Structure formats: structure tokens, C-alpha cells
């Protein structure tokens, strides 16, 4: 068992939209990511996805519903199959919780797709 200090973990990398694996439990992954600008529209066919904003502000744009704006300390769970796009005007630090095999771009293959996540030290 090792504790994770979120501030130190986020300070250990700078790359945007490139999740880092912070831990795993019961087939679920805890991922940390820095975000700025627009991500890709995508959905996850078989997995719900939790977005928790640690710092900054993040908007989850939705094709078929109203966008959800998350402030620091707020989270939302995007149900499986719901097309969404995370967007932020300035850098946000986010924690993601989802099944370990979930690909960051879901059903979309792009230059931002990450298949082998870097483990935090």
C-alpha cells in the first residue's frame, strides 16, 4: 500500500490529455490527467467514466444533453455509450475512475489515443 499525494503526482508531469496511472483496484483504474483545450468527441461502449476536477474547471460537452461544467472538487459520471467531449479554457487537473482497460479516446482512434499508460512514480 502506498499513498498518493495528488499535488505531487500532478507536479510530476506536464503533458496535456495524456493520463497517468495512479492506482488500480478491483479492475478499476485511477488515472490523473492535465487538460487544456478540446479533447475528441468519443464514447465508451462498455464503461462508465468518472471525471473529478482536482483544480481548474472542466466542461463535459454532450451531444444529446446540456453541457456539464465542473468546478474544483466536483465530479460527474458519464454513463457508458454517451458521446462526450471534455473541454477547458485553461489547464485543469482531473482524476478519472474507470475500468482498467478503458481507452482514453473510447471508440475513436486519434493522435491522442493512449494504450499503455505511464505509471506514476
Regions found by a protein language model. Name each.
Residues 15-16, 29-45:
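Conserved short histidine dyad/triad with adjacent acidic residue
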Residues 80-108:
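Ligand-binding loop in jelly-roll beta-barrel domains
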Residues 34-35, 44-63, 97:
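Short, conserved beta-strand element in jelly-roll/cupin
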Residues 26, 54-55, 71-72, 90:
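A cytosolic small-molecule/anion-sensing beta-strand core signal
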Residues 28-29, 58, 66, 82:
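Short acidic/polar mixed-charge low-complexity motifs
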Amino acid at each position: 500500500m502506498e499513498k498518493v499525494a495528488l499535488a505531487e503526482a500532478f507536479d510530476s508531469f506536464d503533458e496535456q490529455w495524456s493520463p497517468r496511472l495512479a492506482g488500480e483496484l478491483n479492475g478499476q483504474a485511477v488515472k490523473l490527467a492535465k487538460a487544456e483545450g478540446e479533447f475528441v468527441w468519443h464514447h465508451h461502449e462498455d464503461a462508465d467514466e468518472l471525471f473529478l476536477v482536482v483544480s481548474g474547471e472542466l466542461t463535459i460537452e454532450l451531444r444529446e444533453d446540456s453541457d456539464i461544467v465542473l468546478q474544483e472538487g466536483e465530479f460527474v459520471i458519464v454513463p457508458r455509450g454517451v458521446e462526450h467531449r471534455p473541454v477547458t479554457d485553461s489547464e485543469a487537473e482531473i482524476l478519472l475512475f474507470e475500468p482498467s482497460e478503458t481507452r482514453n479516446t473510447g471508440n475513436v482512434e486519434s493522435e491522442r489515443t493512449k494504450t499503455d499508460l505511464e505509471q506514476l512514480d
